[in-house]
């Protein structure tokens, strides 16, 4: 069975199937620093993980898009502090033109769920 949560015409914020939660991409507040945007993204990920019956410790994969790879270290400092030790997911990070020019980071997470 597929369960969709927070559904709009364009997307669902959470899709659950066979014990896996797929979260839509999360962005931070436009105009903030990369660190601030990353922190906001991860706060939103936390909320969606909880809503999906999951947690940081159950993350399977993360895909991170940066508008500029020169922000990699700044984003990683926030990410590294957020991920529980010993529970790092499979992860990829690349550079992409994001939906709005003021956005600097977008994070997409997949996690095991109840």
Language model: regions and residue ranges:
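N-terminal presequence-like segments and the immediate start of the first folded domain
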Residues: 1-60, 66-114
């Amino acid at each position: 069975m597929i369960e969709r949560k927070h559904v709009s015409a364009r997307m669902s914020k959470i899709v659950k199937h066979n014990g896996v939660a797929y979260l839509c991409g999360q962005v931070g507040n436009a105009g903030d620093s990369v660190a601030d945007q990353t922190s906001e993204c991860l706060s939103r990920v936390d909320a969606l993980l909880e809503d999906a019956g999951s947690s940081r410790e159950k993350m399977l994969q993360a895909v991170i898009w940066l508008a500029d790879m020169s922000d990699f270290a700044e984003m990683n400092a926030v990410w590294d502090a957020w991920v529980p030790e010993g529970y790092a997911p499979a992860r990829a990070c690349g550079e992409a033109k994001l939906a709005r020019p003021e956005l600097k980071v977008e994070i997409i997470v997949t996690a095991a769920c109840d």
